[in-house]
Design a protein with these regions (language model features):
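N-terminal Rossmann-like FAD-binding beta1-loop-alpha1 element of flavoenzymes
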Residues: 2-27
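Short hydrophobic core segments
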Residues: 6, 192-201
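Glycine-rich FAD pyrophosphate-binding loop
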Residues: 20-41
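Dinucleotide-binding Rossmann-like beta1-alpha1 core, especially the glycine-rich loop
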Residues: 44-129, 248
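Flavin (FAD/FMN) cofactor-binding and adjacent substrate-gating region
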Residues: 88-165, 170, 178-180, 254, ...
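Conserved beta-strand-loop-beta-strand element in the redox core of flavoprotein oxidoreductases
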Residues: 178-191
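Flavin (primarily FAD) binding-site architecture
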Residues: 198-213
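C-terminal catalytic lobe of FAD-dependent flavoproteins
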Residues: 216-223, 232-233, 240-258, 265-358
Length: 358
């Protein structure tokens, strides 16, 4: 059985790899280079997504926590465990008991994890860990576990596994359109497949529109921007954006500190960059928690990527991070998805194709 996978991000790569493992002959198409867009512009985290518990997305968080541990076990050379601190102040929007219940659920959903559970730290203990943390009105904080990765190198590792078992990778090969009968159109040619998997991420709906195919699902294309500053990160943090319900991360990254992310709706026809306003926003949020504040000159790098969120809310911060796999004839469309759950998503794709094709 011949399968075409459209999209060389982490979801497409994972689908191609596991489909080839299952015995399918797979061609993987990407309009540019593999993992060159959204998949290399993440927060570099392998995580369950503690904040998704606020949207009651227990299934997603459980799956992501299981997948987090699986990545850490499977590729230790490109991943590492991480202990993050979530400090709580008198004026924090989320109280100590609220965060405590959330982390209790997080630990419970993780099951028999390879990572240690969360624990409470007093203000005194936090300041002993990081003397530059803003101490005014500090109550204490929770320390909890997640994972970190080199997203681009890990995606390339998946690509290597796929290529080794026979996936035919076609880089710089844009797909013009597809149809529900298994026909894939590229410049100057129409190629027939037994099934096509549309794993083109933020461009999934756009490909359908170009193909004249309708779907009940919409994507909210949301830009997430990050800055890298020339400061060694001694402690990783999950922090509330001051005066907002949003959160952001402070993480170690190659002897520097990574700060992100933002959430700004993005037109796919526009250039995807971290704007000056976003840089100011992230610096201001970070500095509210520090005695040793940063200046714009401390920024040594910045990047941005577009996330394909299934449209479920006016506020993208409240949109689901779940994924949906939709079948339309000989076409499987993937909407949404997180980096951490890419292999779980791919297993679901394989299971669906096994039912339809075997």
């Amino acid at each position: 059985m011949r399968i075409a996978v459209v999209g060389g991000g982490i979801n497409g790569l994972s689908c191609a790899w596991l489909l080839a493992q299952a015995g399918y002959k797979v061609d993987l198409y990407d309009r540019g280079k593999l993992a060159s867009e959204t998949s290399k512009a993440s927060s570099k985290l392998l995580h369950g997504g503690i904040r998704y518990l606020e949207q009651y997305e227990f299934r997603l968080v459980r799956e992501a926590l299981k997948e987090r541990d699986d990545w850490l076990r499977r590729v230790p050379s490109l991943t590492n465990p991480l202990r993050l601190v979530l400090p709580i102040y008198k004026n924090s929007k989320r109280s100590r008991w609220f965060i405590g219940i959330g982390l209790f659920l997080y630990d419970h959903l993780a099951g028999k994890s390879i990572l240690p559970p969360s624990k409470w730290l007093s203000a005194k203990e936090l300041l002993k860990i990081d003397s530059q943390l803003q101490s005014h009105d500090l109550i204490g904080g929770y320390e909890f576990s997640d994972g970190q990765m080199d997203d681009f190198k890990l995606a390339m590792w998946v690509a290597e596994q796929a290529i080794q078992i026979g996936v035919n990778v076609k880089e710089n090969q844009p797909v013009d359109k597809v149809d529900v009968n298994g026909n894939l159109h590229v410049v100057g040619d129409i190629i027939h497949y037994d099934f096509i998997v549309n794993a083109s991420g933020p461009w999934a709906v756009k490909l359908l529109e170009k193909s004249g195919i309708t779907s009940p699902y919409r994507l909210d294309t949301v830009k997430g921007s990050h800055i890298v500053v020339s400061r060694k990160c001694e402690q990783s943090y999950l922090l509330e954006v001051p005066n907002e319900s949003r959160i952001f991360f402070v993480l170690p990254w190659r002897e520097n500190t990574l700060i992100g992310t933002t959430e700004v709706r993005q037109n796919l026809d526009d250039v995807v960059i971290c704007s000056e306003e976003e840089k100011d926003y992230l610096l201001a949020a970070y500095n509210r928690y520090r005695k040793d504040s940063l200046k714009k000159e401390d920024i040594v790098d910045s990047y941005a990527g577009v996330r394909p969120l299934i449209y479920t809310a006016e506020d993208p911060n409240k949109a689901t991070r779940e994924y949906i796999i939709e079948r339309d004839g000989k076409l499987l469309n993937i909407f949404g998805g997180k980096w951490t759950t890419a292999l779980a998503l791919a297993r679901n794709v394989v299971n669906q194709l096994d039912r339809y094709c075997k």
